[in-house]
Structures are given as C-alpha cells and as structure tokens.
Amino acid sequence: MNAPDSPNALAARSELTDLMQRMGSGAKVASAHMARASAAVKNWALSKLATLLRQNVKALDNANQRDLARAQAAGLAGPLLDRLRLSPKDIETVALGCEQLAAMPDVIGEIIGMKEQPSGIRVGQMRVPIGVFGMIYESRPNVTIEAASLAIKSGNACILRGGSEAIESNKALASLVQQALLDAGLPADAVQLVPTTDREAVGLLIAMPQYVDVIIPRGGKGLIERISREAKVPVIKHLDGNCHVYVDDPCDIDMAVRVADNAKTQKYSPCNASEGLLVARGVAAGFLPKIGAVYAAKGVEMRCDAEARALLAGVAGANLQPVSEQDWYEEYLAPIISIKVVAGIDEAIAHINQYSSHHTDAILTRDHMHAQRFLREVDSASVMVNASTRFADGFEFGLGAEIGISTDKFHARGPVGIEGLTSLKYVVLGNGEVRT
C-alpha cells in the first residue's frame, strides 16, 4: 500500500480527481440535452431499458453472483447480503418500474399556478429538471436502475457511486442503461457509474458544486452522516428507518395481527420495516398473545416492557427480552422488534415523535378521529392508517420508482420520485406591461 503522500499515491489521487472532473463535466453537458429531450424520446429509452433488463437476466445474475461470493468470503452480515442480492424477481420489478415511469405523464415544462396580476402580467411556475444529481449508495444494485430511470424520466443527468460490494452488478446494469440511452439518441453521459471502488471518489463527488446540483445518499447511518457533514452541495437524505406500528383501541384484532406481521417480517432489511410495536392497553390482552405467536413462529426476538412481557409470557417458543431505552431508537434491520403497551393514542403519538426517525409510522384503528389525529400529529414523512409500513416505497406509491426516502422537510419529503428531482422557476407572461 502506498503512503498517503508517496509519489504513487499522489499520482493515483490526481488520476481519480481527473476522472471525477471528466464525469462531472460530461454530466453537466448531458443534463442540457436531457432537459430538452421530448417525453416520447425519454419514454422510449425507458421502455428499451426494460427490454434490455429482461433480455439480460442471466448475465446480470452472473455478475451479482460474483458480488455475492466476494461478499460472503469477506464475512458480510446477513442483512447486507440480502440487500446485495439481485434476483430475477428484483430485475422484473425494476423493469416494471421503468415501464410504469414511461407510462406516467411528463411533468417537465408543466406550468402551475398561473394567475393574472393587477398589473396585467400573468405569473406562474414551470417545473424543470434539477440538472445533475449524484447518487451514493451501498449494496442494493437495484438502486442503479431506479436512479437511472428517474434521471431519464425527469430530464436530469446523474453520477452513480455504488458500494464496492456491488461493483460487478452495478457495472452490468449501468452498461444496459447507457445502451438504452444511446439507442434513444440521448447522451450516454446522462447516466454514469463511477468505475472505481476507491472511497476517495465519494469525497470528490460531494465537493463538485460546479457540476453537481444535489447529492442523494442511500446507505448506513455513518455514510449519510459523513456526506451531510462534508458535502458542498445540498443533500436529500434519511438517516434511519425506525418505523412504528401502533395498535389502537378500538381496532380489528385479526387485521392488526396481519398488518403488524407484514410490517415486521415481510422483509427485515428495508428501511420501511417496522422496528417498534405500540399497543393500546385496552386491546393488549387480546392482541399481544396472537402477534406474539406469529413472531415466535418466525424467530423474531421481542424486546418488551414489563407489561408486554407479562402478556406474552404464555406464548410457546417466544424469545422475550427486556427492552432498554436505546432499543426505542434502534433500527434493527433484523428479526427483532421492541414492544410497548401504552395508555392510548396520546402516549403512542408522543412516543413516536420522541423516538422514531420520522420515516414511516402506522396506526391500526377503527376510530376515525384517532386516525385523523395520527395523520396530523405524527411528525413523519409517511403516515399510514390500517396499512403496513412496508408500503412506504415509490413503486407502491405509484411514483414508478424512487430515488430514496427523505425525512427532511426541504426540498423533498417521503419517497422521492420524479417531482422530487425537479424544481420550480417563475415564468412571467406579459403584453408589453411596464412597472409604474
């Protein structure tokens, strides 16, 4: 390994800097072409990409298997391996996402809020592409297609920097994206993948405001905190996915069991999986033994307060552990859930607003007024009534795909789709008016 200041290390850094500058410059030029591209051309590129994905399932699987083998040899943890895996079903899902995006209306150039002013001028706002976004993500090779397809549909260019563990999968996917762009007559530089696993590429990408308009990180808390701290351009992000399900009094117990099960166990690794379960005292005795039996059968560890533990004590095979203060903040990404019995909706809302990551939280209830209070008062990017937190996803929300989920309150919040990758500029239409 070269010393940080050795001639070889300095030369390597210079080469990496040159590479990132070329990519940034190319993306900036390509973004102007993308902003002018017609809806028909962009949609054709997306349809072509869907076709290429389906035609290359075997090649993509081979690339992904190489990544998985290397990750397993390196001792990558189970949840991270799950995120790295790109199955034929995953490929079909992102292909469908491309087609769904192609079928959606093109919002670029849309003018909203046009009103005539007392002076006679008409003032409105036009939706335009952001320009160039940088996408930094770990594992999850499907993000390569989600980001690329949204860039195409929204008329933006993007620079993608995936995790080193997924480099083979990402290269294979990015090559298909560039083929689709070229076949559509669009610049290949509109979607570029950083071809190196050198971590210094991240530091360079987030410090190029002359080329990159926004950075969108998806990954572990450490990565996102670093980018938020060091970036010289705006960042759209979320740090954690500490999501909650609150079982209200009154509720449909059978429905609540079904939803609470799905929110936790349908898949453990996504950021919209439930990590906390709050149960109103009035329904706890009827609900907890039933959900406890489901969790026990699936090997879910239950970290409970004293009241919940007492109600779950008779469940065969239940792995019950005392809950700690830190558990309320925890994003487990594993078969573990924290459980608390609360007095009612007031305590549930207070608990969620104190401990959640403001990502996605759900109430299961038969009380319309409680549902409305929950929607108004829970300070999260997505709030749900009688539905699993696992629905907090751009594809499920009808966005076609998502670039990420933002828990910030500016510029975008919740799943970030096409509109989240645009900005509004004022347009003024006149007929020779002058200001007096």
From Swiss-Prot:
Q: In which pathway does it act?
A: Amino-acid biosynthesis; L-proline biosynthesis; L-glutamate 5-semialdehyde from L-glutamate: step 2/2
Q: Name one Pfam family in it.
A: Aldedh
Question: Is Oxidoreductase among the key words of this record?
Answer: yes
Mind listing the GO biological process terms from this record?
L-proline biosynthetic process
Which compartments is it annotated to reside in?
Cytoplasm
What one GO molecular function would you report for this record? Answer: NADP binding
Q: Which InterPro entries match?
A: Ald_DH/histidinol_DH, Ald_DH_C, Ald_DH_N, Aldehyde_DH_dom, G-glutamylP_reductase_CS, Glu-5-SA_DH, GPR_dom
Annotated family: Belongs to the gamma-glutamyl phosphate reductase family.
Leading EC class: oxidoreductase
Alphabetized CDD domains for the sequence: ALDH_F18-19_ProA-GPR
The name on file for this protein is: Gamma-glutamyl phosphate reductase
Question: HAMAP family annotated for this entry?
Answer: ProA
What SUPFAM superfamilies does this protein's entry cite?
ALDH-like
Looking at the UniProt record for this protein, which Gene Ontology cellular component terms does it annotate, in alphabetical order?
Answer: cytoplasm
Task: Identify the EC number(s).
Answer: 1.2.1.41
Going by the entry's taxonomy, the superkingdom of the source organism is recorded as Bacteria
